Every structure is written in C-alpha cells, then in structure tokens.
Amino acid sequence: MPIRVLDELPAVNFLREENVFVMTTSRASGQEIRPLKVLILNLMPKKIETENQFLRLLSNSPLQVDVQLLRIDARESRNTPAEHLNNFYCNFEDICDQNFDGLIVTGAPLGLVEFNDVAYWPQIKQVLEWAKDHVTSTLFVCWAVQAALNILYGIPKQTRTDKLSGVYEHHILHPHALLTRGFDDSFLAPHSRYADFPAALIRDYTDLEILAETEDGDAYLFASKDKRIAFVTGHPEYDAHTLASEYFRDVEAGLSPNVPYNYFPKNDPQNKPRATWRSHGNLLFTNWLNYYVYQITPYDLRHMNPTLD
C-alpha cells in the first residue's frame, strides 16, 4: 500500500532507500481515489525511528494510506527535534472533529509507571473514548494494550518482576481468523515490556477473542468480534537493531539487563542480530488494514457506521 505522507517527512527518503513505495502528498493529489485515513498516536520517545517502523508496515498494498501523526504530550521532547514535531504532528484539538478509518496507538516506555502517574493519562483516556465514535478500527501495541485494557475493560495493571526482552515463539489459536490469515502455525515476534498479559486474565475480564499466544500462555494477539479494536502485545514493527539498542542503553545506564532471549546469534551481544519476524509483521498489518479497516469502513467518513457485511 503506498503510504501518503508530507513530502518533507524524513521517512520518505529513509524508506525509499529500502525500496518501500512512498507516495508524497503532491503525487497522491493526482489520483482520483479515496485513501484510507490512518492516524498514528506516537507515544515512543524516538518518534522519527518509530515513524519509519510503522510506515514501513503500512506500505505494502495497492491502496493509498493517508497517514496523520498525532501527539498528546505537550512537554518538550529530549529525543525528537521540536521543529519535526511542529511540522509533522497534529494535536488532538486539530483532529477531534474528524473521522478516521484506522488508528494505531504505539507502545511507550512506561511499564513501571502507574497509570495515574503518566503525564498524559487523561489525554489517553480522551483519545480512546473519542475513537469509539470517530475511528473504524484501532490497533494497540505493547504498552498501549495495557492502557486500553484498563480504560476499556477495567483490567488492573499487571507488571512482571523482570523485563521481558527478546524474540519469542507464538502459536495461532484460530487458523481461519481474518487477522491471522496466512500466518504460520508458529511464528516469532519481539517483545520488550514489563507488562504482563496472562491469557486467562483477558478471558476472565473481556469477551475479546485471543488469536495467538506465547508458548508460556501469554496473550499476544487478540481482538473484538466486531473488529473495532485489536491488540498486539509485542513489537512486530521493531527493526533488527532495536532490541540491541535498548539492551546497550540499559547496560550503559548500569541496569544490568538480561541479554534479549533468542536474539543475538549464539547469545553473544557482540554478534549482529538478524530480524526473524519481518514477514509476520508485514502480514499482520496487511490483514488489519484489509479485514479490520478497508472492508468495514464507510466510503463516506462523514457518516461513521462500520459494517461487518
């Protein structure tokens, strides 16, 4: 899917170097089709890196995706230039009267922070409530899953003693589910989280359908039956080097982190890691865009009435 972004966004050149099809706004304006409108609420500190990761996954289909970047944290960023945020991000007040085909809420490094201590917790709740009436389908990633489960279902925060970091095996539970269509029976995906997602807890608190689990019984991929919300507890968007960057950052900070599981060749951090989850990540996002967004979203977004027909 050619992603449609502003001509000056740094991701344009970065992704083109990877042979990813990026369509700038100036070129897209000449095509007489309605693009899918996808809003990305980027909660990660290194926003440009995260933009590249998600835009890459949204790019592989013949339909246009018009991407809008959203921020809700008004504090000065230490990792992203203010000029970049001012040029390419909108505030919630700018888009609250609009409707969108899809919304992606990224993870955030807040696993050890209580929800009420998160600086923008009220804004998170506001966006999730707004999305019920203004977005066809929302995809939550990693920490955003934990936040959404608390806001939407009242599930208390579950925190692991040690951080889960590495590339783990998962298995699908419903081979014919649309979101897992084309998945291998077992597949790899990276995790980097303190949050805990026991499948039994999610079944007890919600009517969400768990579609894939880790080998230890943690929920990895689950969704509502009406396709309006979907959750992925790992990081299928991560680059090959992302877990390594996090690991060496924590080493330098004196945190004595565990070496990410099943990640470095021969479990040696001096060896260059390889991405073993790219095909899974691409297929997951393609399925979400096709079956959870495109096939149920209304043609006229002024009348938000998703249908399963």
From Swiss-Prot:
The protein's annotated pathway: Amino-acid biosynthesis; L-methionine biosynthesis via de novo pathway; O-succinyl-L-homoserine from L-homoserine: step 1/1
Site entry: Important for acyl-CoA specificity: G111
Signal sequence range: none
CDD domains attached to this UniProt entry: GATase1_HTS
Keywords annotated in UniProt: Acyltransferase, Amino-acid biosynthesis, Cytoplasm, Methionine biosynthesis, Transferase
Annotated compartments: Cytoplasm
Gene3D superfamilies referenced in this protein's UniProt entry, alphabetically: 3.40.50.880
InterPro entries: Class_I_gatase-like, HST_MetA, MetA_family
Residues the record marks as active site: C142, H235, E237
Classification via Pfam families: HTS
Keyword Cytoplasm included in the entry's annotation: yes
Site (Important for substrate specificity): S192
Residue intervals passing through the bilayer: none
Residues bound to substrate: K163, S192, R249
Main localisation: cytoplasm
Reported function: Transfers a succinyl group from succinyl-CoA to L-homoserine, forming succinyl-L-homoserine.
Record-given protein name: Homoserine O-succinyltransferase
Gene: metAS
